[in-house]
Amino acid sequence: MSYTPSSNDLIAISPMLILCGVALLSLVVQFLIPEEDEGKPLWVLSILGILVAMYALYHTTNSPGYGKFFGSQISISPLTVWLSAIYLIAGLITLLVAPPFLSQHKTLFPEFFPLMLFCLSGMMFLTSGYDLIVIFVGLEILSLSLYVMIGMARTSVSALESAMKYFLLGTFSSGFMLLGIAFLYGGSGTTNLDGALRGLSLKGYEANFSKLGLGLFFVGVSFKAALVPFHSWTPDVYEGAQTPITGFMASAGKASALGLVIILFNHIPMGEMGNVWKYLMGTIALISMTWGNIVALKQDNLKRMLAYSSISHAGYIVAGIACGAGLEALYYLFSYSLLNLAAFAIISYLEQGKHEVTVNGISHLSGEHPFTALALSLVFLSFAGFPPLIGFWTKLFLLQKMAESDLFFHRVLLFGAVANSCIAFYYYMKITIQSYMKQETGVVAGARDLPSLPTLGFLIFLLCVFFTAGWIFFQPGSLL
Protein backbone atom coordinates (compact mmCIF):
# COMPACT_ATOMS: atom_id res chain seq x y z
CA MET A 1 0.00 0.00 0.00
CA SER A 2 1.48 3.36 -1.06
CA TYR A 3 1.33 6.42 1.16
CA THR A 4 1.98 10.00 0.06
CA PRO A 5 3.12 12.27 2.91
CA SER A 6 1.17 15.48 3.35
CA SER A 7 2.71 18.86 4.12
CA ASN A 8 1.69 18.45 7.77
CA ASP A 9 3.53 15.13 7.90
CA LEU A 10 6.74 16.76 6.68
CA ILE A 11 6.38 19.74 9.01
CA ALA A 12 5.88 17.38 11.96
CA ILE A 13 9.30 15.80 11.40
CA SER A 14 10.97 18.99 10.15
CA PRO A 15 13.37 19.19 13.16
CA MET A 16 14.69 15.70 12.37
CA LEU A 17 14.88 16.48 8.64
CA ILE A 18 16.86 19.65 9.36
CA LEU A 19 19.33 17.79 11.57
CA CYS A 20 19.81 15.01 9.00
CA GLY A 21 20.12 17.54 6.16
CA VAL A 22 22.76 19.59 7.98
CA ALA A 23 24.60 16.37 8.89
CA LEU A 24 24.71 15.29 5.24
CA LEU A 25 25.82 18.78 4.23
CA SER A 26 28.61 18.61 6.83
CA LEU A 27 29.87 15.38 5.31
CA VAL A 28 30.31 17.22 2.01
CA VAL A 29 31.69 20.47 3.47
CA GLN A 30 34.45 18.68 5.38
CA PHE A 31 36.18 17.92 2.08
CA LEU A 32 36.11 21.60 1.08
CA ILE A 33 37.73 23.15 4.17
CA PRO A 34 41.47 23.26 4.90
CA GLU A 35 42.73 20.74 7.43
CA GLU A 36 44.21 23.38 9.75
CA ASP A 37 40.76 24.84 10.46
CA GLU A 38 40.02 21.82 12.71
CA GLY A 39 36.40 21.81 11.67
CA LYS A 40 35.49 25.37 12.71
CA PRO A 41 33.09 25.82 9.77
CA LEU A 42 31.50 22.47 10.65
CA TRP A 43 31.18 23.59 14.27
CA VAL A 44 29.35 26.77 13.21
CA LEU A 45 27.19 24.84 10.74
CA SER A 46 26.22 22.26 13.39
CA ILE A 47 25.28 24.90 15.95
CA LEU A 48 23.18 26.73 13.37
CA GLY A 49 21.52 23.43 12.45
CA ILE A 50 20.53 22.77 16.05
CA LEU A 51 19.23 26.32 16.51
CA VAL A 52 17.11 26.04 13.35
CA ALA A 53 15.86 22.63 14.53
CA MET A 54 14.86 24.24 17.85
CA TYR A 55 12.85 26.85 15.99
CA ALA A 56 11.23 24.17 13.83
CA LEU A 57 10.37 22.16 16.95
CA TYR A 58 8.67 25.20 18.47
CA HIS A 59 6.84 25.84 15.20
CA THR A 60 5.44 22.28 15.09
CA THR A 61 3.47 22.93 18.29
CA ASN A 62 1.42 25.56 16.42
CA SER A 63 1.37 24.13 12.92
CA PRO A 64 0.52 21.31 12.38
CA GLY A 65 0.08 20.99 16.16
CA TYR A 66 -0.12 17.83 18.23
CA GLY A 67 -1.39 14.58 16.77
CA LYS A 68 -0.48 11.53 14.69
CA PHE A 69 1.33 11.79 11.36
CA PHE A 70 2.57 9.53 8.57
CA GLY A 71 -0.38 7.19 9.04
CA SER A 72 0.11 7.02 12.83
CA GLN A 73 3.83 6.26 12.47
CA ILE A 74 4.85 9.51 14.21
CA SER A 75 3.26 11.10 17.27
CA ILE A 76 3.83 14.73 18.26
CA SER A 77 2.69 15.48 21.81
CA PRO A 78 3.74 17.88 24.59
CA LEU A 79 5.83 15.06 26.09
CA THR A 80 7.72 14.32 22.86
CA VAL A 81 8.31 18.03 22.23
CA TRP A 82 9.83 18.55 25.68
CA LEU A 83 11.96 15.44 25.34
CA SER A 84 13.20 16.66 21.95
CA ALA A 85 14.01 20.03 23.53
CA ILE A 86 16.15 18.25 26.14
CA TYR A 87 18.12 16.47 23.41
CA LEU A 88 18.69 19.64 21.40
CA ILE A 89 19.80 21.65 24.44
CA ALA A 90 22.16 18.85 25.49
CA GLY A 91 23.57 18.64 21.96
CA LEU A 92 24.07 22.40 21.78
CA ILE A 93 25.90 22.53 25.13
CA THR A 94 28.06 19.56 24.14
CA LEU A 95 29.07 21.29 20.90
CA LEU A 96 30.09 24.35 22.92
CA VAL A 97 32.13 22.34 25.44
CA ALA A 98 33.62 19.47 23.42
CA PRO A 99 35.79 21.03 20.65
CA PRO A 100 38.51 22.53 22.94
CA PHE A 101 38.78 19.24 24.84
CA LEU A 102 38.86 17.11 21.70
CA SER A 103 41.43 19.42 20.07
CA GLN A 104 43.66 19.05 23.10
CA HIS A 105 43.48 15.27 22.74
CA LYS A 106 43.92 15.52 18.95
CA THR A 107 40.60 13.73 18.42
CA LEU A 108 38.53 16.56 16.92
CA PHE A 109 37.74 14.82 13.65
CA PRO A 110 35.33 16.43 11.15
CA GLU A 111 33.02 13.42 11.42
CA PHE A 112 32.23 14.31 15.04
CA PHE A 113 29.79 17.05 14.02
CA PRO A 114 27.55 15.09 11.60
CA LEU A 115 27.60 12.15 14.01
CA MET A 116 26.28 14.41 16.76
CA LEU A 117 23.46 15.64 14.51
CA PHE A 118 22.54 12.12 13.38
CA CYS A 119 22.52 11.04 17.03
CA LEU A 120 20.12 13.85 17.96
CA SER A 121 17.79 12.98 15.09
CA GLY A 122 17.81 9.33 16.23
CA MET A 123 16.82 10.37 19.74
CA MET A 124 13.94 12.43 18.39
CA PHE A 125 12.68 9.57 16.23
CA LEU A 126 13.03 7.22 19.20
CA THR A 127 10.58 9.14 21.38
CA SER A 128 8.41 10.60 18.59
CA GLY A 129 7.85 7.24 16.94
CA TYR A 130 4.39 5.74 17.32
CA ASP A 131 5.38 2.53 15.58
CA LEU A 132 7.74 -0.06 17.02
CA ILE A 133 9.78 -0.16 13.80
CA VAL A 134 10.26 3.63 13.84
CA ILE A 135 11.28 3.44 17.50
CA PHE A 136 13.81 0.72 16.73
CA VAL A 137 15.27 2.60 13.75
CA GLY A 138 15.62 5.73 15.90
CA LEU A 139 17.39 3.69 18.57
CA GLU A 140 19.84 2.26 16.04
CA ILE A 141 20.64 5.69 14.55
CA LEU A 142 21.32 6.94 18.08
CA SER A 143 23.37 3.90 19.09
CA LEU A 144 25.54 3.64 15.97
CA SER A 145 26.42 7.34 16.22
CA LEU A 146 27.43 6.95 19.86
CA TYR A 147 29.53 3.85 19.16
CA VAL A 148 31.60 5.78 16.62
CA MET A 149 31.88 8.95 18.74
CA ILE A 150 33.20 6.93 21.69
CA GLY A 151 35.74 5.12 19.51
CA MET A 152 37.04 8.24 17.74
CA ALA A 153 39.92 8.48 20.23
CA ARG A 154 41.88 5.90 18.26
CA THR A 155 45.07 6.31 20.31
CA SER A 156 43.28 5.67 23.61
CA VAL A 157 43.08 2.01 24.58
CA SER A 158 40.39 2.72 27.19
CA ALA A 159 38.22 4.58 24.65
CA LEU A 160 38.50 1.77 22.11
CA GLU A 161 37.73 -0.79 24.80
CA SER A 162 34.69 1.24 25.89
CA ALA A 163 33.45 1.55 22.31
CA MET A 164 33.83 -2.19 21.70
CA LYS A 165 32.12 -3.12 24.98
CA TYR A 166 29.25 -0.70 24.35
CA PHE A 167 28.91 -1.90 20.75
CA LEU A 168 28.82 -5.62 21.61
CA LEU A 169 26.43 -5.28 24.55
CA GLY A 170 24.33 -2.71 22.69
CA THR A 171 23.98 -5.01 19.70
CA PHE A 172 22.97 -7.82 22.02
CA SER A 173 20.28 -5.66 23.65
CA SER A 174 19.04 -4.48 20.23
CA GLY A 175 18.54 -8.13 19.32
CA PHE A 176 16.31 -8.54 22.38
CA MET A 177 14.30 -5.48 21.36
CA LEU A 178 13.86 -6.73 17.81
CA LEU A 179 12.77 -10.15 19.03
CA GLY A 180 10.34 -8.42 21.41
CA ILE A 181 8.87 -6.45 18.50
CA ALA A 182 8.38 -9.70 16.59
CA PHE A 183 6.47 -11.27 19.50
CA LEU A 184 4.39 -8.12 20.03
CA TYR A 185 3.47 -8.20 16.34
CA GLY A 186 2.64 -11.90 16.62
CA GLY A 187 0.30 -11.24 19.53
CA SER A 188 -1.48 -8.19 18.14
CA GLY A 189 -1.01 -8.22 14.35
CA THR A 190 0.33 -4.65 14.31
CA THR A 191 3.50 -2.73 15.12
CA ASN A 192 1.53 0.40 15.98
CA LEU A 193 2.44 1.24 19.58
CA ASP A 194 -1.08 1.44 20.96
CA GLY A 195 -2.29 -1.64 19.11
CA ALA A 196 0.78 -3.74 19.88
CA LEU A 197 0.50 -3.14 23.63
CA ARG A 198 -3.27 -3.69 23.55
CA GLY A 199 -2.46 -7.35 22.94
CA LEU A 200 -1.64 -7.59 26.67
CA SER A 201 -5.34 -7.39 27.48
CA LEU A 202 -6.29 -10.23 25.11
CA LYS A 203 -6.75 -13.89 26.04
CA GLY A 204 -4.96 -17.01 24.89
CA TYR A 205 -1.71 -17.27 22.97
CA GLU A 206 -1.99 -13.66 21.73
CA ALA A 207 -1.63 -12.39 25.30
CA ASN A 208 1.30 -14.73 25.96
CA PHE A 209 3.09 -13.51 22.84
CA SER A 210 2.48 -9.90 23.87
CA LYS A 211 3.74 -10.45 27.43
CA LEU A 212 6.90 -12.13 26.19
CA GLY A 213 7.38 -9.44 23.56
CA LEU A 214 7.03 -6.57 26.01
CA GLY A 215 9.44 -8.27 28.41
CA LEU A 216 12.09 -8.65 25.71
CA PHE A 217 11.50 -5.08 24.54
CA PHE A 218 11.98 -3.78 28.09
CA VAL A 219 15.30 -5.65 28.31
CA GLY A 220 16.63 -3.50 25.47
CA VAL A 221 15.20 -0.29 26.92
CA SER A 222 16.61 -1.12 30.38
CA PHE A 223 20.05 -1.58 28.84
CA LYS A 224 19.93 1.90 27.29
CA ALA A 225 18.65 3.36 30.57
CA ALA A 226 21.36 1.49 32.56
CA LEU A 227 18.91 -0.18 34.93
CA VAL A 228 20.07 -3.13 37.05
CA PRO A 229 20.82 -5.87 35.97
CA PHE A 230 21.58 -4.40 32.53
CA HIS A 231 23.98 -1.77 33.82
CA SER A 232 27.38 -3.49 33.71
CA TRP A 233 28.60 -1.46 30.71
CA THR A 234 27.97 1.92 32.33
CA PRO A 235 31.01 2.53 34.60
CA ASP A 236 33.57 1.24 32.10
CA VAL A 237 32.09 3.13 29.15
CA TYR A 238 31.64 6.36 31.12
CA GLU A 239 35.24 6.18 32.35
CA GLY A 240 36.81 5.18 29.05
CA ALA A 241 34.95 7.56 26.73
CA GLN A 242 36.16 11.12 26.29
CA THR A 243 34.58 13.25 28.98
CA PRO A 244 32.37 15.55 26.81
CA ILE A 245 31.02 12.46 25.01
CA THR A 246 30.33 10.85 28.38
CA GLY A 247 28.41 13.95 29.44
CA PHE A 248 26.30 13.79 26.28
CA MET A 249 25.57 10.08 26.85
CA ALA A 250 24.68 10.67 30.49
CA SER A 251 22.30 13.52 29.65
CA ALA A 252 20.64 13.20 26.24
CA GLY A 253 21.27 9.46 25.89
CA LYS A 254 19.83 8.70 29.30
CA ALA A 255 16.90 11.08 28.75
CA SER A 256 15.94 9.37 25.48
CA ALA A 257 15.86 5.90 27.06
CA LEU A 258 13.91 7.02 30.12
CA GLY A 259 11.62 9.14 27.95
CA LEU A 260 10.75 5.96 26.05
CA VAL A 261 9.95 4.28 29.39
CA ILE A 262 7.48 7.09 30.17
CA ILE A 263 5.84 6.67 26.76
CA LEU A 264 5.57 2.88 27.10
CA PHE A 265 3.97 3.16 30.54
CA ASN A 266 1.45 5.63 29.15
CA HIS A 267 0.34 3.01 26.62
CA ILE A 268 0.29 -0.15 28.75
CA PRO A 269 -3.40 -1.08 29.27
CA MET A 270 -4.84 -0.48 32.72
CA GLY A 271 -5.91 -3.44 34.79
CA GLU A 272 -4.24 -6.47 36.28
CA MET A 273 -1.55 -6.80 33.61
CA GLY A 274 -0.70 -3.11 33.81
CA ASN A 275 -0.22 -3.42 37.57
CA VAL A 276 2.07 -6.43 37.09
CA TRP A 277 4.38 -4.39 34.87
CA LYS A 278 4.37 -1.50 37.33
CA TYR A 279 5.37 -3.85 40.15
CA LEU A 280 8.08 -5.37 37.97
CA MET A 281 9.58 -2.04 36.90
CA GLY A 282 9.21 -0.63 40.41
CA THR A 283 11.23 -3.55 41.77
CA ILE A 284 13.94 -3.02 39.14
CA ALA A 285 13.95 0.69 40.02
CA LEU A 286 14.37 -0.02 43.74
CA ILE A 287 17.28 -2.40 43.10
CA SER A 288 18.87 0.09 40.67
CA MET A 289 18.79 3.05 43.01
CA THR A 290 20.14 0.97 45.91
CA TRP A 291 22.89 -0.81 44.00
CA GLY A 292 24.02 2.36 42.21
CA ASN A 293 24.35 4.35 45.42
CA ILE A 294 26.07 1.62 47.44
CA VAL A 295 28.75 1.02 44.79
CA ALA A 296 29.18 4.78 44.20
CA LEU A 297 30.22 5.13 47.86
CA LYS A 298 33.45 3.26 47.13
CA GLN A 299 34.45 5.13 43.96
CA ASP A 300 37.39 7.52 43.82
CA ASN A 301 37.27 8.31 40.10
CA LEU A 302 34.64 11.02 39.55
CA LYS A 303 33.51 9.63 36.19
CA ARG A 304 32.92 6.17 37.66
CA MET A 305 31.13 7.76 40.62
CA LEU A 306 28.82 9.62 38.24
CA ALA A 307 28.28 6.41 36.27
CA TYR A 308 26.97 4.56 39.31
CA SER A 309 25.09 7.69 40.34
CA SER A 310 23.37 7.65 36.93
CA ILE A 311 22.18 4.10 37.64
CA SER A 312 20.59 5.27 40.88
CA HIS A 313 19.01 8.32 39.23
CA ALA A 314 17.50 6.08 36.56
CA GLY A 315 16.04 4.08 39.45
CA TYR A 316 14.49 7.21 40.99
CA ILE A 317 12.86 8.18 37.71
CA VAL A 318 11.48 4.72 36.92
CA ALA A 319 10.19 4.40 40.50
CA GLY A 320 8.35 7.69 40.01
CA ILE A 321 6.96 6.52 36.66
CA ALA A 322 5.72 3.29 38.29
CA CYS A 323 3.88 5.48 40.83
CA GLY A 324 2.21 7.55 38.11
CA ALA A 325 4.65 10.46 37.78
CA GLY A 326 4.54 12.14 34.39
CA LEU A 327 5.38 15.85 34.63
CA GLU A 328 7.57 15.15 37.63
CA ALA A 329 9.62 12.52 35.80
CA LEU A 330 9.98 14.82 32.79
CA TYR A 331 11.23 17.69 34.97
CA TYR A 332 13.64 15.31 36.72
CA LEU A 333 15.02 14.31 33.31
CA PHE A 334 15.43 17.95 32.30
CA SER A 335 17.27 19.04 35.44
CA TYR A 336 19.32 15.84 35.66
CA SER A 337 20.49 16.30 32.06
CA LEU A 338 21.62 19.88 32.75
CA LEU A 339 23.47 18.84 35.90
CA ASN A 340 25.23 15.99 34.11
CA LEU A 341 26.35 18.29 31.33
CA ALA A 342 27.68 20.79 33.89
CA ALA A 343 29.47 18.10 35.92
CA PHE A 344 31.22 16.51 32.95
CA ALA A 345 32.08 19.92 31.47
CA ILE A 346 33.89 20.86 34.69
CA ILE A 347 35.61 17.47 34.87
CA SER A 348 36.80 17.80 31.27
CA TYR A 349 38.22 21.21 32.12
CA LEU A 350 40.04 19.80 35.16
CA GLU A 351 41.51 16.91 33.21
CA GLN A 352 43.46 19.24 30.91
CA GLY A 353 44.41 16.28 28.74
CA LYS A 354 46.56 14.60 31.37
CA HIS A 355 44.78 14.17 34.69
CA GLU A 356 42.33 11.53 35.86
CA VAL A 357 40.01 13.49 38.13
CA THR A 358 39.57 11.67 41.44
CA VAL A 359 38.08 12.59 44.79
CA ASN A 360 41.56 12.79 46.34
CA GLY A 361 42.82 14.69 43.32
CA ILE A 362 40.56 17.69 43.95
CA SER A 363 41.86 18.24 47.50
CA HIS A 364 42.10 21.96 48.37
CA LEU A 365 40.77 22.89 44.94
CA SER A 366 39.12 26.00 46.40
CA GLY A 367 42.47 27.43 47.48
CA GLU A 368 43.94 27.17 43.99
CA HIS A 369 40.85 27.63 41.81
CA PRO A 370 37.90 29.12 43.73
CA PHE A 371 35.56 29.50 40.75
CA THR A 372 36.04 25.91 39.66
CA ALA A 373 35.54 24.62 43.21
CA LEU A 374 32.37 26.69 43.60
CA ALA A 375 30.88 25.45 40.32
CA LEU A 376 31.79 21.81 41.06
CA SER A 377 30.38 21.98 44.59
CA LEU A 378 27.13 23.58 43.44
CA VAL A 379 26.59 20.88 40.83
CA PHE A 380 27.22 18.01 43.25
CA LEU A 381 25.14 19.63 46.00
CA SER A 382 22.33 19.92 43.48
CA PHE A 383 22.75 16.23 42.62
CA ALA A 384 22.38 15.54 46.35
CA GLY A 385 19.11 17.49 46.50
CA PHE A 386 20.45 20.30 48.68
CA PRO A 387 17.86 23.09 49.01
CA PRO A 388 17.16 25.36 47.26
CA LEU A 389 19.14 24.13 44.25
CA ILE A 390 17.42 22.63 41.23
CA GLY A 391 18.13 19.06 42.37
CA PHE A 392 16.12 19.69 45.53
CA TRP A 393 13.02 20.69 43.59
CA THR A 394 13.21 17.71 41.26
CA LYS A 395 13.43 15.20 44.09
CA LEU A 396 10.79 17.02 46.12
CA PHE A 397 8.20 16.95 43.34
CA LEU A 398 8.98 13.34 42.43
CA LEU A 399 8.71 12.18 46.05
CA GLN A 400 5.49 14.18 46.52
CA LYS A 401 3.95 12.35 43.57
CA MET A 402 5.06 8.99 44.98
CA ALA A 403 3.58 9.90 48.37
CA GLU A 404 0.12 10.60 46.88
CA SER A 405 -0.61 6.88 46.54
CA ASP A 406 -1.78 4.76 49.48
CA LEU A 407 -0.60 1.50 47.90
CA PHE A 408 1.85 -0.41 50.08
CA PHE A 409 4.25 -1.03 47.19
CA HIS A 410 4.35 2.68 46.36
CA ARG A 411 5.15 3.40 50.01
CA VAL A 412 8.03 0.93 49.77
CA LEU A 413 9.34 2.74 46.69
CA LEU A 414 8.98 6.08 48.48
CA PHE A 415 10.91 4.83 51.51
CA GLY A 416 13.58 3.35 49.23
CA ALA A 417 13.96 6.63 47.34
CA VAL A 418 14.29 8.67 50.56
CA ALA A 419 16.78 6.22 52.09
CA ASN A 420 18.86 6.17 48.93
CA SER A 421 18.85 9.96 48.75
CA CYS A 422 20.43 9.97 52.21
CA ILE A 423 23.10 7.50 51.07
CA ALA A 424 23.82 9.58 47.97
CA PHE A 425 24.12 12.74 50.07
CA TYR A 426 27.26 11.30 51.68
CA TYR A 427 29.31 10.77 48.55
CA TYR A 428 28.10 13.99 46.92
CA MET A 429 29.07 15.98 50.03
CA LYS A 430 32.47 14.28 49.95
CA ILE A 431 33.28 16.31 46.82
CA THR A 432 32.60 19.63 48.56
CA ILE A 433 34.46 18.59 51.71
CA GLN A 434 37.47 17.46 49.69
CA SER A 435 37.69 20.63 47.63
CA TYR A 436 37.13 23.08 50.51
CA MET A 437 38.26 21.49 53.78
CA LYS A 438 41.36 19.46 52.87
CA GLN A 439 44.67 21.28 53.18
CA GLU A 440 46.76 18.97 51.01
CA THR A 441 46.86 20.10 47.39
CA GLY A 442 45.47 17.51 44.95
CA VAL A 443 46.73 16.49 41.53
CA VAL A 444 44.33 18.64 39.50
CA ALA A 445 45.21 21.83 41.37
CA GLY A 446 47.69 22.57 38.60
CA ALA A 447 44.89 22.89 36.07
CA ARG A 448 43.63 26.26 34.93
CA ASP A 449 40.75 27.84 36.78
CA LEU A 450 37.45 28.21 35.03
CA PRO A 451 37.10 31.69 33.52
CA SER A 452 35.25 33.88 36.00
CA LEU A 453 32.68 35.31 33.56
CA PRO A 454 31.40 31.94 32.23
CA THR A 455 31.38 30.59 35.78
CA LEU A 456 29.33 33.51 37.06
CA GLY A 457 26.98 33.10 34.11
CA PHE A 458 26.55 29.43 34.94
CA LEU A 459 25.82 30.23 38.60
CA ILE A 460 23.28 32.90 37.64
CA PHE A 461 21.62 30.38 35.33
CA LEU A 462 21.38 27.87 38.19
CA LEU A 463 19.88 30.54 40.46
CA CYS A 464 17.26 31.43 37.84
CA VAL A 465 16.38 27.79 37.33
CA PHE A 466 15.84 26.87 40.97
CA PHE A 467 13.90 30.06 41.75
CA THR A 468 11.49 29.46 38.86
CA ALA A 469 11.23 25.70 39.38
CA GLY A 470 8.58 25.91 42.09
CA TRP A 471 6.41 28.26 40.03
CA ILE A 472 6.61 25.99 36.99
CA PHE A 473 5.51 22.94 38.90
CA PHE A 474 2.71 24.54 40.85
CA GLN A 475 1.27 25.43 37.44
CA PRO A 476 1.73 22.16 35.53
CA GLY A 477 -0.22 23.46 32.57
CA SER A 478 2.66 25.80 31.82
CA LEU A 479 4.75 22.77 30.86
CA LEU A 480 2.25 20.59 29.04
UniProtKB/Swiss-Prot annotation:
Keywords tagged on the record: Cell inner membrane, Cell membrane, Membrane, NAD, Quinone, Translocase, Transmembrane, Transmembrane helix, Transport, Ubiquinone
Record flagged with keyword Glycosyltransferase: no
Listed name of the protein: NADH-quinone oxidoreductase subunit N
CC per GO annotation: plasma membrane
Alphabetized InterPro entries for the sequence: NADH-Q_OxRdtase_suN/2, ND/Mrp_TM
Family indicated by similarity: Belongs to the complex I subunit 2 family.
Transmembrane segments: 13-33, 41-61, 81-101, 107-127, 132-152, 167-187, 212-232, 245-265, 276-296, 314-334, 373-393, 413-433, 454-474
PANTHER family: NADH DEHYDROGENASE
A Pfam family of this chain: Proton_antipo_M
Gene: nuoN
Organism: Leptospira biflexa serovar Patoc (strain Patoc 1 / Ames)
BP GO terms, sorted: ATP synthesis coupled electron transport
Oligomeric form and interacting partners: NDH-1 is composed of 14 different subunits. Subunits NuoA, H, J, K, L, M, N constitute the membrane sector of the complex.
UniProt membrane topology term: Multi-pass membrane protein
Function field: NDH-1 shuttles electrons from NADH, via FMN and iron-sulfur (Fe-S) centers, to quinones in the respiratory chain. The immediate electron acceptor for the enzyme in this species is believed to be ubiquinone. Couples the redox reaction to proton translocation (for every two electrons transferred, four hydrogen ions are translocated across the cytoplasmic membrane), and thus conserves the redox energy in a proton gradient.
